[in-house]
Amino acid sequence: MGKDVIVACDFASTEATFAFLDKFADCQRKPFLKIGMELYYAEGPAIVKEIKARGHKIFLDLKLHDIPNTVKKAMNVLSRLDVDITNLHAAGTKNMMKAALEGLTRPDGSRPLLIAVTQLTSTDQESMENDLLIREPIDEVVMHYAQCAAESGLDGIVCSPLEAGKVHDRCGRNFLTITPGVRFADGDVGDQKRVMTPAAAKAIGSDYIVVGRPITAAADPVAAYERCVAEFCD
């Protein structure tokens, strides 16, 4: 997979999701889609299968975090959905990440890409220290989680675009960085605290960017998506 824009389908129902996707019916480039907790928990595996049937790649964003055996079994179930990327929390430890990778790998050796979440882009230094009692600088925490994920055999991490370049320096250029917290220069940052524009994310080395409301809530979602692709992929 090359650089791509992943559109966060943060909708509550199949109807709302397909009302959005229908706007892209005439587009040659089918958006890579992120299905998160709200939509997956509302509609279940059926929504994944229906979207795949339309020809979209899918990042199933459920952020698993539990004891290793539970995560292994859950990943085994997810491996049957034919998604392209899925993820977990790096804070679950190396043992959990290794178990997840084992569960996700199919009998023929194939599997979706497995990505670790480091620190959410809604987390800043103050909230990390006060709420999580983590005193280390946030960029060092991200680097530590990235190193643990790489040593566990994962394909990359979700991180702020502010950390993408440092992650590649630490873990190698082939270790993928998927970066939310991307907004247009003239857009609202919403509840994200560590943000960057698509062009800046490209310059710093992000492999994928995840964009939600700047596209899904735009007056013209197709134009917003194409603008994002032009800034990041072209």
What are the functions of these language-model segments?
Residues 27-28, 54, 81, 152, ...:
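Structural motif
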Residues 3-9, 33-35, 58-62, 86-88, ...:
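Hydrophobic faces of well-ordered beta-strands that scaffold small-molecule active sites
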Residues 81-93, 192-224:
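Glycine-rich phosphate-binding active-site loops on the catalytic face of alpha/beta enzymes
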Residues 23-31:
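A short, Lys/Arg-enriched amphipathic alpha-helix followed by its capping loop at the start of a domain
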Residues 14-19, 39-54, 66-73, 90-113, ...:
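Active-site-adjacent beta->alpha loops and helix N-cap segments on the catalytic face
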Residues 12-24, 69-77, 138-148, 193-200:
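Short, acidic/polar
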Residues 2, 70-74, 79-155, 163, ...:
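Conserved anion-binding
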